[in-house]
From Swiss-Prot:
Subunit annotation: Homotrimer; forms a homotrimer with a central pore that forms a path between the two membrane leaflets.
The name this protein goes by in its record: Autophagy-related protein 9
InterPro entries: Autophagy-rel_prot_9
Organism name: Debaryomyces hansenii (strain ATCC 36239 / CBS 767 / BCRC 21394 / JCM 1990 / NBRC 0083 / IGC 2968)
Cellular component terms (Gene Ontology): autophagosome; cytoplasmic vesicle membrane; endoplasmic reticulum membrane; Golgi membrane; phagophore assembly site membrane
PANTHER family reported in the protein's UniProt record: APG9 AUTOPHAGY 9, AUTOPHAGY-RELATED PROTEIN 9
Residues annotated as transmembrane: 228-248, 273-293, 550-570, 589-609
A matching Pfam family: ATG9
Keywords: Autophagy, Cytoplasmic vesicle, Endoplasmic reticulum, Golgi apparatus, Lipid transport, Membrane, Phosphoprotein, Transmembrane, Transmembrane helix, Transport
Amino acid sequence: MSEYNQNSNNDTFLSRVFGLHSVYNQLQDEYQYYDPDVDYQQSFMNGGVLSSHVREEGNENTNNDNTNLLDSESDSDSSSSLSSPPSPIVSFTGKEHNQNEDSTKVHWDTTRPHYGQDNDITTSIPKDPPKKNMVNTAKNFINKLHPATDSLPMYNQPQQFRKPPPEGPSVQTVYQKKQHKSKRKYVIPPKERALYLWANITNMDEFLTDVYYYYRGNGMLNIVLTRLVDLLILAFILSFTVFLKWGINYDFFMSSSSDRASVTLKDLVIPNFISEMVPVSVKLLLLGFSGYIVLRLVQLYFDYNYKLKEIKNFYHYLIGIPNDDELMTISWIVIVERLMALKDYNSLTSTNTNLPAQFLSDLNSKVRLNAHDIANRIMRKENYIIALINKEVLDLSLSIPFLSNVNSFLSNKSVLTKTLDWNIKLCINNFIFNQHGQINSHVLKDFNRNQLSKELSARFKMAAIINLLLCPFIVIYFVLLYFFRYFNEYKSNPSSILGLRQYTPWAEWKLREFNELPHFFIKRLHLSIGPANIYINQFPRGFWVINLMNFVNFVSGAITAILVLMGLWFDNEEHNFWSFEITENKSSLFYISLFGTVWAITSSSLTSTNSNTSENLNSQTSSFFYDPEASLRYVSQFTHYLPSSWNGRLHTVQVKNEFCELFSMKIIIIINEILSLILTPFILWFKVSNSSGAIIDFFREYSIHVDGLGYVCYFAMFNFEQKDKNMMMSLNKSKKRKPRKSRANAKKKASSKSKSRSDEIELDNVNSNKADKSKLSDSETSSNSDDNDDTDINNDYYQDDKMIKSYMYFLETCGNDKAKQASKLTSNEQLSTKPSRIAKPDNSQSVVGDPTPSFLYQPLTSNSIDDSSYNINYNIDEQEEESSKGKRSGVLGMINQFYKHDRNR
């Protein structure tokens, strides 16, 4: 614990930016990083991890520090607790592999427990024979006191990587000797280093995020080049803008053009314009941006040396992807399966059961590593943001007095932009989560609620002040960025900017499923763009708009045609029609470009409008049917968004307008992004800061602790037992907190009523919790209120059940073949099943509704990569469940579990 506190105190802003406390540089001082000079020696390794050895006759008596990184707070479970038994370790030696030795035998010693287990990927790792004295096994990596064989290293004890020079050189040595002034070091080969790093990962969230980032970035070269290009674009925009503003003598250009004298760019450039013409404020701004670029370059250097190289070796030697080009074609599921095959070679994830009895309790809290758990770790923070947006915890709408027409455009759907989204995530993530990716312990304690709310509100206000100060510079930068980026596209295809649509940032969070990785989500949205455009184009536009566009298209086309023909006819050596000024300082080329652009825009709009007419239906290769309802249902197969409020109105213009708020014009999104740079400070100060208390309540109430995984968002675990926390429409409307006493009394009433109605206990709990949170009238006051409340419960529950949709989609994308087939069968049964009748919780009547989740989703087959997480009937820890009978559950149980874990630290 003292070691962890010391590391926490040394943690600074720059250390976190540059990754100085990363999992890749938590090694000893004597550890030598990977050197590319030893690549040529891989031919001597013969496919093994350690196929050669280093001979020596003596050893060094060095004093090693007792550093134990496994005791750090890595995953907020009992495996990282100091009170838990010591974790087993394996010595890392360099003796030559013995082919006749049984590599599957595990040897134990009472003085230093360790374990080892073979895997298909590293079958060449042998094990040590049993020794009476294993005190110095950590030193046997280089110092060979006894014959030893290769095994996997663990980080429980410090290891010595130095040795005195041998008497004679050995041709079998795979460690490259480095000459130093006073000592010699040996470089570990890449494959051994990859194994060592994987065996000693202490922050699994950071490592898996880096693995996914490397996969999504298509390798180290593409990641480095992409980040360099971004910095070059920033530097080009700054330098080119300053050059155009203060580096060219435009007065001399205008005077020389009237004299018809030949002028070159060299004549127009002002010498020493940076020191003489550029204002001091602009120089300070350029200095600040230059410092930012330097920091980004330093960060890229650290990431390249300490992250990207290590991840590349990990993919190459352990995942089995020697070439980064294969990352563009390989599926993420294949990488997940290969990661799971390596779990027995990591001290946090090993599930070896052939261990002595004293280690059984320690193995119960091992880090979980399957497809669901990997997605939960990568999406730990994003899952909370998805739930925040879907439950409408954040109030982002603005209301300007005396401007009611403008207020309709300043709703949550239009105000939430990339800039505001980045500021909100920056304030929340750095406040809620610690450096290990886990939720801070004080956030989960109820008595800290008011203090945390004030601190988070102060963070939002500080971010508002910073955005207000940087607003002028950021606005100029983004205007230039969008102009340079989209002008060429607009010039080649004018309709690409004014006619194309894309999903808004608010829609991206609204449509995203829990545990859905970014590349799956982007693919799903891209598949929906075509059907969404077809659905919108089926609705006819206003008659005024259509006729006006026809007139403008005809007039602009006629004028453009006449100007082009006149230029071709009258242009010769004596007369230059293209430079003829139709108006003052406006030549014919200017008007040809202007009217040609108008004609292209109106033509593309009319083409999309008239593409569904009877004249064009016969010319289309594929059959087309005018059916907006069927088109929207087809779009919902990709967006997974079809609220029950749209039922019976899918063909109406109102539903189409609501869908267009999600799928908006691209030019409108760009304008909103620019306006957001001005509105973000006011939204952060007046709106988001007022939601600080609701944000703290959300993280406390919807965070559950999973043994071996830590605290995660409730909805990401796909737990269908507690329906009161599911995505209901009525819960989104509740903003105030209910006292715990009334909630506890409601639970007691619900439990007393459940004795006579055991078949209806789940819906009864839903009704009681919903009545408390929504502050509805008590169901026992009158029979009329019972009927209304029960009807609302069923309608709200089945209106937008996002957690169930996320569960089904996760099975389709990340499950095995059997799981995918099971999910497709159940989804087809759900679509084909007629509405069933569900019993009301408070009476014997029934209402029409959809089947419950327990009927929709069947248990998955065993022996699959997702069996432990995707089966809703799966128990995470059977031994812990047996020992915890009679314990409290729900919120009180979660708090009790948290305090127990907090004491064990």
